């Protein structure tokens, strides 16, 4: 343990409470339990996104208490805070989904406000659901004080008739039911067995993707992203996070030391190798923006072209994230990639050690395991996340093609201005093989909030049309989505992007090899449509109204603090 004199020296921010004129401030703090000796300790915030309404977060209040134990053992004064969460799985397919991406920035802002307002010297952030992770790390980058992210862990798979199932099994079950392949009773059995306890959704979906990416970035303890929610290892690494953040204070180690360009390159590399969520593009861009690291959407294509897809994980594969934990977890994958020249081993992490030094403590992948395929025989020779461009997406779009055999799809558009309209068309069998289903005016500004389309995409897959019908949107897709899907189309319809002027019957081309997203239209016809079609007004009420008016394009990470140079005086 650090001695008191050294501890007092670590109070880079909380020392503002020391002077005589701050006696009233200390009076308030004494009511929270602080004694004379505690005013010589650094204040460490412990923030959790605990909530009772979702399995991803239901256990996080107790995890916050564990982190406090670690902080206390390291000699600092822990203070537990809470912030919000929005469950994507519960909000999915409802108007509540508009608040999902919005919550990422609310989380970031609320952490910054709480830690800044209370002059914390460092903090641990604990998250479980999709937007918790990037929201926490955006706050870390903006504040640039010692901080560690601790993931609440992945959920165990459900089991039905001897087979592993998960939440996406239920979403797809609805499609099977609509197609006549399942009874209501069979779907109910899926519903009742898919989620057996606490933890983030179990495949290589957004929560596990972002937890992995943050570990690779270096802001989570090595190995922690793979530990299941109910494991002893998870409880241990939550407590250790409390001790580790005090060590960061001692070392003077800050997020800006860790969040380098090389760190983001490694995060993209591992995301490609594991077949991570399309949402990773959005969130890594946003984190890089907060960290003042130059990262663009097209950078993802650089790594897509050279990093093979190795993981046989859901949604396109057989295994869940807990299976990866059993064969060595994220560190074993990183060791494999490092040995083969894919990662930067010499960059610093939250432990104060380099990536290579951290990985020495971990075993290689279990011999004979089937979760991670060898580089000589990958699941796919390049990465599964592709950035597309063309006259339908001048600023880019994101396609996830893991498990998709179709390299090129050309078909007529069927255009909808909401997911609800598109779902109704699918349920009524109005969508036929070859169609390109388009859902627009659901981007960051248009949604507002860029809702995900898992309900729609899962129904299409469940009906057996996953590789026969393409799905395009200026909104997002869940990490649980697979099939022929393209999202994040930019500029979005609400900004007057070409997708706003696409009409039912227009022929759309999606090409993996040329990375093209195109629709057949003459310049004259496009100009005519632009002159005659009126765009709807921006949403104007409450938090969604605020969000719609300030959020950037998805191609810039849908950030809420992107200012043009003329607005800041900076270039």
Swiss-Prot record:
<dbReference type="InterPro" id="IPR020558">
    <property type="entry name" value="DiOHA_6PGluconate_deHydtase_CS"/>
</dbReference>
<feature type="binding site" description="via carbamate group">
    <location>
        <position position="131"/>
    </location>
    <ligand>
        <name>Mg(2+)</name>
    </ligand>
</feature>
<keyword id="KW-0001">2Fe-2S</keyword>
<dbReference type="GO" id="GO:0009099">
    <property type="term" value="P:L-valine biosynthetic process"/>
</dbReference>
<feature type="active site" description="Proton acceptor">
    <location>
        <position position="478"/>
    </location>
</feature>
<comment type="similarity">
    <text>Belongs to the IlvD/Edd family.</text>
</comment>
<feature type="binding site">
    <location>
        <position position="56"/>
    </location>
    <ligand>
        <name>[2Fe-2S] cluster</name>
    </ligand>
</feature>
<protein>
    <recommendedName>
        <fullName>Dihydroxy-acid dehydratase</fullName>
        <ecNumber>4.2.1.9</ecNumber>
    </recommendedName>
</protein>
<dbReference type="InterPro" id="IPR004404">
    <property type="entry name" value="DihydroxyA_deHydtase"/>
</dbReference>
<keyword id="KW-0456">Lyase</keyword>
<comment type="subunit">
    <text>Homodimer.</text>
</comment>
<keyword id="KW-0411">Iron-sulfur</keyword>
<keyword id="KW-0408">Iron</keyword>
<dbReference type="InterPro" id="IPR037237">
    <property type="entry name" value="IlvD/EDD_N"/>
</dbReference>
<comment type="function">
    <text>Functions in the biosynthesis of branched-chain amino acids. Catalyzes the dehydration of (2R,3R)-2,3-dihydroxy-3-methylpentanoate (2,3-dihydroxy-3-methylvalerate) into 2-oxo-3-methylpentanoate (2-oxo-3-methylvalerate) and of (2R)-2,3-dihydroxy-3-methylbutanoate (2,3-dihydroxyisovalerate) into 2-oxo-3-methylbutanoate (2-oxoisovalerate), the penultimate precursor to L-isoleucine and L-valine, respectively.</text>
</comment>
<dbReference type="InterPro" id="IPR042096">
    <property type="entry name" value="Dihydro-acid_dehy_C"/>
</dbReference>
<feature type="binding site">
    <location>
        <position position="88"/>
    </location>
    <ligand>
        <name>Mg(2+)</name>
    </ligand>
</feature>
<dbReference type="GO" id="GO:0009097">
    <property type="term" value="P:isoleucine biosynthetic process"/>
</dbReference>
<feature type="binding site">
    <location>
        <position position="129"/>
    </location>
    <ligand>
        <name>[2Fe-2S] cluster</name>
    </ligand>
</feature>
<keyword id="KW-0100">Branched-chain amino acid biosynthesis</keyword>
<comment type="pathway">
    <text>Amino-acid biosynthesis; L-valine biosynthesis; L-valine from pyruvate: step 3/4.</text>
</comment>
<comment type="pathway">
    <text>Amino-acid biosynthesis; L-isoleucine biosynthesis; L-isoleucine from 2-oxobutanoate: step 3/4.</text>
</comment>
<dbReference type="Pfam" id="PF00920">
    <property type="entry name" value="ILVD_EDD_N"/>
</dbReference>
<feature type="modified residue" description="N6-carboxylysine">
    <location>
        <position position="131"/>
    </location>
</feature>
<dbReference type="GO" id="GO:0051537">
    <property type="term" value="F:2 iron, 2 sulfur cluster binding"/>
</dbReference>
<dbReference type="GO" id="GO:0004160">
    <property type="term" value="F:dihydroxy-acid dehydratase activity"/>
</dbReference>
<keyword id="KW-0460">Magnesium</keyword>
<dbReference type="InterPro" id="IPR056740">
    <property type="entry name" value="ILV_EDD_C"/>
</dbReference>
<feature type="binding site">
    <location>
        <position position="452"/>
    </location>
    <ligand>
        <name>Mg(2+)</name>
    </ligand>
</feature>
<dbReference type="InterPro" id="IPR000581">
    <property type="entry name" value="ILV_EDD_N"/>
</dbReference>
<feature type="binding site">
    <location>
        <position position="130"/>
    </location>
    <ligand>
        <name>Mg(2+)</name>
    </ligand>
</feature>
<keyword id="KW-0028">Amino-acid biosynthesis</keyword>
<dbReference type="GO" id="GO:0000287">
    <property type="term" value="F:magnesium ion binding"/>
</dbReference>
<keyword id="KW-0479">Metal-binding</keyword>
<dbReference type="InterPro" id="IPR050165">
    <property type="entry name" value="DHAD_IlvD/Edd"/>
</dbReference>
<feature type="binding site">
    <location>
        <position position="201"/>
    </location>
    <ligand>
        <name>[2Fe-2S] cluster</name>
    </ligand>
</feature>
<dbReference type="Pfam" id="PF24877">
    <property type="entry name" value="ILV_EDD_C"/>
</dbReference>
């Amino acid at each position: 343990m650090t001695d008191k004199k050294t501890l007092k020296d670590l109070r880079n921010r909380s020392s503002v409470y020391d002077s005589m004129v701050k006696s009233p401030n200390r009076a308030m703090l004494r009511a929270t339990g602080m004694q004379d000796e505690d005013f010589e300790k650094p204040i460490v915030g412990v923030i959790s996104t605990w909530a009772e309404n979702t399995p991803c977060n239901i256990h996080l209040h107790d995890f916050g208490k564990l982190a406090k134990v670690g902080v206390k053992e390291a000699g600092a004064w822990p203070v537990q805070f809470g912030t919000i969460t929005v469950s994507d799985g519960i909000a999915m397919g409802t108007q509540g989904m508009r608040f999902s991406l919005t919550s990422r920035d609310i989380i970031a802002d609320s952490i910054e406000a709480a830690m800044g307002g209370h002059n914390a010297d460092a903090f641990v952030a604990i998250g479980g659901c999709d937007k918790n992770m990037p929201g926490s790390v955006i706050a870390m980058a903006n504040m640039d004080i010692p901080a560690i992210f601790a993931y609440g862990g992945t959920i165990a798979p459900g089991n039905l008739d001897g087979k592993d199932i998960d939440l996406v099994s239920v979403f797809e079950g609805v499609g099977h039911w609509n197609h006549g392949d399942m009874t209501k009773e069979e779907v109910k059995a899926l519903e009742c067995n898919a989620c057996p306890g606490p933890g983030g959704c179990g495949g290589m979906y957004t929560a596990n993707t972002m937890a992995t990416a943050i570990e690779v970035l270096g802001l989570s303890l090595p190995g922690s992203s793979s530990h299941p929610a109910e494991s002893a290892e998870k409880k241990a690494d939550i407590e250790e996070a409390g001790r580790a953040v005090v060590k960061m204070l001692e070392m003077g180690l800050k997020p800006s030391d860790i969040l380098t360009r090389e760190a983001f390159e490694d995060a993209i590399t591992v995301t490609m190798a594991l077949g991570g969520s399309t949402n990773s593009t959005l969130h890594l861009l946003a984190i890089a923006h907060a960290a003042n690291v130059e990262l663009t959407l097209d950078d993802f294509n650089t790594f897509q072209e050279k990093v093979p897809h190795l993981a046989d994980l859901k949604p396109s594969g057989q295994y869940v994230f807990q299976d990866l934990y059993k064969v060595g977890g994220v560190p074993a994958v990183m060791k494999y990639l490092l040995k083969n020249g894919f990662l930067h081993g010499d960059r610093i992490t939250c432990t104060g050690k380099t990536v290579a030094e951290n990985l020495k403590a971990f075993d290689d992948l279990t011999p004979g395991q089937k979760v991670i395929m060898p580089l000589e025989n990958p699941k796919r020779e390049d990465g599964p996340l592709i950035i597309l461009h063309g006259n339908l997406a001048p600023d880019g779009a994101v396609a996830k093609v893991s498990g998709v055999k179709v390299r090129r799809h050309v078909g007529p558009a069927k255009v909808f201005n909401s997911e609800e309209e598109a779902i109704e068309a699918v349920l009524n069998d109005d969508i036929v093989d070859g169609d390109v289903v388009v859902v627009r005016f659901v981007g960051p500004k248009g949604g507002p909030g860029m809702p995900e389309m898992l309900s729609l995409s899962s129904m299409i897959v469940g009906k057996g049309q996953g590789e026969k019908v393409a799905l395009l949107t200026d909104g997002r897709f869940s990490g649980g989505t697979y099939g022929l899907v393209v999202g994040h189309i930019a500029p979005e319809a609400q900004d007057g992007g070409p997708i706003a002027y696409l009409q039912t019957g227009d022929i759309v081309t999606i090409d993996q090899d040329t990375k093209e997203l195109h629709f057949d239209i003459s310049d004259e016809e496009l100009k005519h449509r632009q002159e005659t079609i009126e765009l709807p007004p921006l949403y104007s009420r409450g938090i969604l109204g605020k969000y719609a008016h300030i959020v950037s394009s998805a191609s810039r990470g849908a950030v809420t603090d992107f200012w043009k140079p003329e607005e800041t005086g900076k270039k």
